Amino acid sequence: MGNDFDESASMSTVLAYGKSGLRVQLPARNVVRTLRYKSVSPLQDPDASLAQALAEPTGTPPLIEVATGRSSACILICDITRPVPNEQLLKPILNQIQQAGIARTDITILIATGLHRPNEGDELVELVGQEIADNYRVENHFGECPEDHEYLGESPRGVPIWIDRRYIEADLKITVGLIEPHFMAGYSGGRKLICPGIASIDTIRVWHGPRFLEHPQATTGCLDGNPVHEENTWIAKRAGCDFIVNVVLDDQRRPAKFVAGDMEAAFLEGVDFVRSVVVDTVERPVDLSLIHI
């Protein structure tokens, strides 16, 4: 069959794989359609847009007001598996919460690894930038260390809730993440930094188990009736979250929108934007889909 492949009648596309992508060639006659991000312009001045999001958040007072009077802070960030511009996001957040009176020594940046490996050394610098790595306490979550977690009871569907104690004990709780389609939670971002991000293996084992994953609503782009989304939202609210800062990226991984504020309201604002640029429909069933997320 390989000898019958005619490159002149093929189409070429690049899948998001690794850091540089993976180019593949397919017989043009077999391709029904290529689905891509709809046209969306990256932010012309992302720093100014982020500053505006922090000053005019959705569902909460401005970040500096939320932080005023707090004695300590824990900021959750995604690990190296997510293309989040953490340094760009963290710098104004750190600046504002210190202006509000929280000492640098009372701030913990916690990498929400879930059950992924820790990000250390050069990888940690790549994640947050040299300046932040050198001057702030940046630590990894270890989901398989039960002594690092605090028990908060059970969720409505019986998920045991064990959350990283460093986050639970912080006076100000902030999550920083990325909103994009997710294969089981509907969309990433928002509540996912807490569960599974800083949950223990005992929590993740149930939440990420077949009882939830096999549900027909636990799928990409679906929030309504999705038990995975509903459970980790409930768990995140139980753990507490004072403020979120989430980014939406374009197809070149450039910031297209920032949302900030209330964990649910700001997240849903970001989801609405993502839906407007990524949701599309194939007109008929196909035999095979090549998907990169």
Predicted segments, located by residue:
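Histidine-anchored nucleotide/phosphate-binding helix
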Residues: 83-102
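N-terminal amphipathic/basic leader segments beginning at the initiator methionine
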Residues: 2-52
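Conserved, well-structured core segments that form the ligand-binding/active-site neighborhood
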Residues: 135-282
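Short, aromatic/basic amphipathic alpha-helical patches
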Residues: 121-133
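Conserved small/polar residues in nucleotide/adenosyl-binding loops
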Residues: 291-293
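Short N-terminal or domain-adjacent regulatory/targeting segments
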Residues: 40-67, 267-278
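Short internal beta-strands
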Residues: 106-114, 246
